[in-house]
Amino acid sequence: MRHQCRVPLLGRPADQRKALLRGLTTQLIREGRVTTTKARAKALRDEAERMITLAKNGSLASRRRVLGYVYDKQLVHALFDKAPTRYGDRNGGYTRITRTVPRRGDNAEMAIIELV
């Protein structure tokens, strides 16, 4: 039984949710930090940490998995070059989520997710 084994749905169909997380992950790897809602930041954390762990592994299969997920090809190659030196001694916990002020329009809880 799959009781309480849920992914964050984010109020979207599966295809839109996957595209949203792919876009946020690409942006986080490119910029180093992203301001988004708290729920999206928590969902993004899992995906971003998975991509960095694959980049630390450095195998061809890992590179192909990340190339299939991240939108920018040059960004993937840069990630695979920098991740082993930047996160080599760290086992997980590559991101930090910091809460910020609520969004003005709908009072949604906002957060900044950044790479450590």
Swiss-Prot record:
Matches recorded under Pfam families: Ribosomal_L17 (PF01196)
Domain of life: Bacteria
GO cellular component assignments: cytosolic large ribosomal subunit
Listed GO biological process terms: translation
GO MF term (any one): structural constituent of ribosome
Keywords, sorted A to Z: Ribonucleoprotein, Ribosomal protein
Keyword Ribosomal protein (UniProt): yes
Cited InterPro entries: Ribosomal_bL17, Ribosomal_bL17_sf
Family statement: Belongs to the bacterial ribosomal protein bL17 family.
Assembly mode: Part of the 50S ribosomal subunit. Contacts protein L32.
Protein name: Large ribosomal subunit protein bL17
Organism of origin: Synechococcus sp. (strain CC9311)
Annotated gene: rplQ
